[in-house]
């Protein structure tokens, strides 16, 4: 099937690669998406709607930004995702990009749980968790090792 996108033009997508979010993303009615992985933005991917050319989210595997991050699916969530014992569930976080890479944030309070075996996903809202919608992608240690100097507002300037 061909998918029209505003970012990548028309692309060919195998039906088997389409991810269904039965409940959609929060605030959006679209339910069918595909993960696009342009080589120039590793480790980030695009979660592109196959129904709306303009709707796409930058996402990242939560392992890339929070090594201790874990989510316990409820029985209802597991059922919606058709997760059986031993099935892999990939957790993706929606990314907010910034002109200064050290200001990139990820939404760890509303991860997307993906069952890659069934190509089913669900955005989950973690209530009462320590995670936020604006978790820094880079930790403080990475920021302090970055070349250049930081001004009072935290922006990097030439060394």
Swiss-Prot record:
This protein's UniProt keywords: Bacterial flagellum biogenesis, Chaperone, Cytoplasm, Translation regulation
Disulphide-bridged cysteine pairs: none
GO biological process: bacterial-type flagellum assembly; regulation of translation
Claim: Kinase is one of the keywords in the record: no
Pfam families in the record: FliW
Quaternary assembly: Interacts with translational regulator CsrA and flagellin(s).
Protein name: Flagellar assembly factor FliW
Native organism: Geobacter sulfurreducens (strain ATCC 51573 / DSM 12127 / PCA)
């Amino acid at each position: 099937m061909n998918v029209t996108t505003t970012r990548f033009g028309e692309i060919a997508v195998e039906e088997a690669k389409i991810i269904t979010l039965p409940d959609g993303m929060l605030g959006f009615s679209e339910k069918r998406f595909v993960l696009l992985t342009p080589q120039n933005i590793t480790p980030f991917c695009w979660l592109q709607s196959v129904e709306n050319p303009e709707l796409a989210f930058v996402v990242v595997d939560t392992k890339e930004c929070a090594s201790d991050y874990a989510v316990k699916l409820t029985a209802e969530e597991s059922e919606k995702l058709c997760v059986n014992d031993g099935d892999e569930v990939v957790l993706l976080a929606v990314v907010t990009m910034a002109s200064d890479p050290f200001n990139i944030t990820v939404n760890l309070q509303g991860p997307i749980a993906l069952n890659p075996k069934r190509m089913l996903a669900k955005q989950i809202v973690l209530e009462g968790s320590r995670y936020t919608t604006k978790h820094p992608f880079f930790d403080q240690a990475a920021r302090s090792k970055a070349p250049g100097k930081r001004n009072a507002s935290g922006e990097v300037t030439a060394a």
